[in-house]
């Protein structure tokens, strides 16, 4: 009920029905004991009443629109805080329990004080390393992790930063001693807080963080901005200063390019369930079936090619099993940045580490106490190999933690086997300095960092114990280019086309079409875009519009076989067989032996009742393709309706001797009846009824041919009698 009342107030505000919204909010606040909120609302109401009074008196106020926006903004902000305050009293969600416990935090636990503790960590750690047995290490790690945790939770649960909070948060960005991981965690807390409640100061902080020198930090901030705008798409229009800052950030267009990349990464994450399903249902079972082939194949570098050459039969078996294609497809998806590990790691999120929400956001750190506990401070042997794998950009942070905990709990022999499988190359290669530095460089690329962070978020919203307490943006339509504040930033042809093509490749015709139409409206369409728009329309069964698009493509890139073929198909679908035929003939001129084209051209001629010409096409098809039942069927029917009964029967007999369908028995029955072989006709009709699965469907199908039979000279009065013979 609290959410419903709040939503109603917000709807009124969006419709600019400010007076109603304020009176609804007044009633909403009756249940809240928060006097500061009541006072803020009263002030906003009074200001609005004065404003309306001046207007009634005809007083011209050049600042009126600005003031109106400010009152509306203030009303909305009061509504936000009222909603949270009321939910704090009733909700069992983790977020609200955090807010209820905020009072217990000592006052000196502000951002600046926590910053000092975090900044001292690298030095404290260095001192411990000099001590025998790393004395005091546990206490240092614990103090650091608890401080980072308090900063995370207090930031997340603070829905409304004061000017002082904002200043202190800026101090974190400016600090040169703060460990980067702590700043990353703080950036995630700011994003989570914005998801619960819009706060201009936090949004402004993210705009600062996007320009931070460290890639980990600026990429997290970028994803944070995208999330904040997806959660509050229209909100920014009330804050011109924030909109102005966004435009300023994008002066050289680089911000838009980066945000567009995040947009694609978010869309790609929505494909994860499909990939998951493919892994579970196709790839893993296929691997299990082909385990012997896999066992005989050795991937990687061979010292001596003579002794270790592969048995070519294994390669063949591998390819013929279809597994080769599937693995290649997965590799391509992985290179593209798709989340191919979700199904593997989804099972590995039950470790105690993942019970705490903030741990899902902590960048992977070999110096995290939970990792040191399992592997020691300086990993050696297999663990050193593991740490190399963990420096690569193949896994997101959350999966790296899972991997470590899993490795720590399995026997040594299995661990070595798993590691060698995962690297899929000889381990020496990983140890090779040049290769491991290439891996490190890959891991430091902005696109890799942001993509892995999106994978971390995906896991949090899909797998964490408290996932049901959060709005899962991955389940919703993600359309960043439609957010008003991003219109000027993302609605640029070179960016829109990447999103359109992504949807097109992933077979989302409706989404791709909307974007192609936008590109066409921006006068930025070439033949390629009209072709793709046409194809999307065709997929949506909007054939007439598809034809329009294809015709435009044909003007821009004349006589392109693909366009002509699709034009023919669409004309055929709307039963304009004359136009379809015209285009099939154009394709035929370019590809005279294309079997499908011959068949469809013949079919169009048959529909136009030009049977002699149709037969020429079907005979040609029968000549170039041996045992072409499709051609035989067409020849049989065209011969029958054209009065060539012997020829018709000859072809139906060929069909009945190979792989007949119910319709073949039915049509052969027609020919037998027309040539006076009543008994044979009744027998064929009985077989047809059997194949159709009963008299009812048989009679329905027979009824469709009734007119043709009468035209061929069968007496209409005989039809009921024949039906009773069947």
Q: What positions do the PLM features span?
A:
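Conserved structural position within tetratricopeptide repeats
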Residues: 30, 518-521, 551-555, 585-589, ...
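Alpha-solenoid helical-repeat scaffolds
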Residues: 362-557
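Start-of-helix register in tetratricopeptide repeats
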Residues: 3, 220, 494, 528, ...
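Terminal, low-structured helical/coil segments at or just beyond the last alpha-helical repeat
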Residues: 694-726
């Amino acid at each position: 009920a609290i959410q419903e009342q709040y939503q109603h107030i917000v709807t009124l505000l969006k419709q600019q029905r400010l007076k109603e919204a304020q009176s609804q909010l007044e009633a909403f606040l009756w249940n809240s004991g928060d006097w500061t909120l009541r006072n803020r609302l009263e002030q906003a109401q009074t200001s609005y009443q004065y404003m309306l009074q001046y207007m009634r008196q005809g007083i011209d106020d050049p600042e009126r629109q600005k003031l109106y926006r400010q009152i509306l903004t203030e009303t909305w902000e009061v509504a936000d805080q009222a909603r949270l305050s009321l939910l704090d009293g009733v909700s069992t969600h983790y977020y609200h329990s955090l807010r209820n416990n905020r009072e217990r935090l000592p006052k000196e636990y502000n951002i600046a004080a926590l910053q000092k503790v975090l900044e001292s960590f690298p030095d404290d750690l260095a001192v411990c390393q000099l001590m025998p047995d790393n004395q005091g290490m546990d206490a240092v790690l614990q103090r650091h992790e608890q401080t980072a945790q308090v900063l995370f939770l207090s930031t997340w649960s603070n829905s409304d930063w004061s000017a002082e909070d904002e200043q202190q948060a800026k101090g974190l960005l400016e600090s040169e001693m703060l460990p980067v991981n702590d700043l990353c965690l703080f950036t995630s807390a700011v994003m989570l807080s914005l998801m619960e409640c819009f706060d201009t100061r936090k949004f402004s902080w993210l705009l600062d963080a996007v320009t931070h020198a460290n890639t980990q930090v600026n990429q997290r901030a970028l994803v944070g901005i995208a999330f904040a705008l997806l959660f509050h798409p229209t909100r920014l229009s009330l804050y011109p200063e924030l909109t102005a800052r966004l435009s300023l950030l994008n002066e050289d267009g680089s911000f838009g390019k980066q945000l567009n990349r995040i947009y694609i990464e978010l869309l790609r994450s929505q494909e994860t369930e499909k990939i998951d399903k493919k892994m579970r249902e196709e790839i893993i079972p296929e691997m299990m079936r082909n385990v012997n082939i896999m066992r005989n194949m050795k991937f990687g570098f061979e010292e001596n090619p003579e002794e270790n050459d592969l048995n070519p039969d294994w390669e063949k078996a591998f390819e013929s099993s279809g597994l080769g294609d599937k693995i290649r497809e997965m590799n391509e998806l992985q290179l593209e940045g798709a989340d191919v590990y979700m199904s593997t790691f989804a099972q590995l999120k039950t470790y105690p580490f993942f019970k705490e929400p903030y741990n899902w956001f902590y960048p992977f750190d070999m110096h995290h106490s939970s990792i040191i506990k399992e592997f020691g401070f300086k990993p050696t042997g297999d663990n050193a190999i593991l740490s190399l794998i963990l420096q690569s950009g193949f896994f997101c942070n959350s999966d790296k933690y899972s991997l470590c905990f899993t490795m720590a709990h399995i026997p040594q022999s299995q661990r070595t086997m798993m590691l060698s499988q995962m690297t899929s190359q000889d381990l020496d290669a990983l140890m090779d300095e040049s290769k491991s530095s290439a891996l490190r460089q890959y891991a430091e690329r902005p696109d890799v960092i942001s993509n892995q962070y999106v994978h971390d978020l995906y896991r949090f919203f899909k797998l964490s114990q408290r996932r049901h307490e959060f709005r899962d943006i991955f389940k919703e339509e993600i359309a960043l280019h439609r957010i008003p504040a991003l219109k000027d930033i993302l609605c640029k042809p070179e960016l829109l086309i990447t999103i359109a093509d992504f949807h097109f490749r992933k077979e989302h015709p409706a989404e791709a079409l909307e974007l192609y139409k936008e590109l066409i409206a921006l006068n930025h369409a070439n033949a390629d875009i009209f072709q793709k728009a046409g194809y999307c329309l065709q997929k949506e069964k909007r054939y007439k519009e598809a034809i329009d698009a294809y015709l435009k493509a044909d003007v821009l890139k004349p006589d392109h076989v693909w366009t002509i073929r699709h034009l023919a198909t669409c004309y055929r679908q709307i039963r304009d067989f004359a136009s379809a035929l015209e285009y099939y003939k154009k394709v035929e001129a370019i590809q005279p032996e294309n079997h499908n084209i011959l068949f469809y051209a013949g079919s169009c001629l048959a529909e136009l009742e030009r049977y002699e010409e149709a037969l020429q096409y079907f005979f040609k098809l029968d000549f170039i393709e041996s045992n072409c039942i499709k051609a035989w069927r067409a020849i049989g029917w065209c011969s029958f309706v054209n009065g060539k009964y012997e020829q018709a029967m000859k072809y139906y007999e060929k069909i009945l001797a190979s792989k007949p369908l119910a319709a073949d028995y039915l049509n052969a029955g027609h020919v037998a009846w027309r040539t006076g072989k009543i008994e044979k006709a009744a027998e064929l009709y009985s077989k047809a009824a059997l194949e159709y699965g009963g008299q009812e469907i048989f009679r329905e199908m027979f009824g469709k041919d009734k007119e043709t039979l009468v035209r061929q000279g069968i007496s209409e009065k005989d039809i009921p009698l024949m039906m009773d013979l069947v």
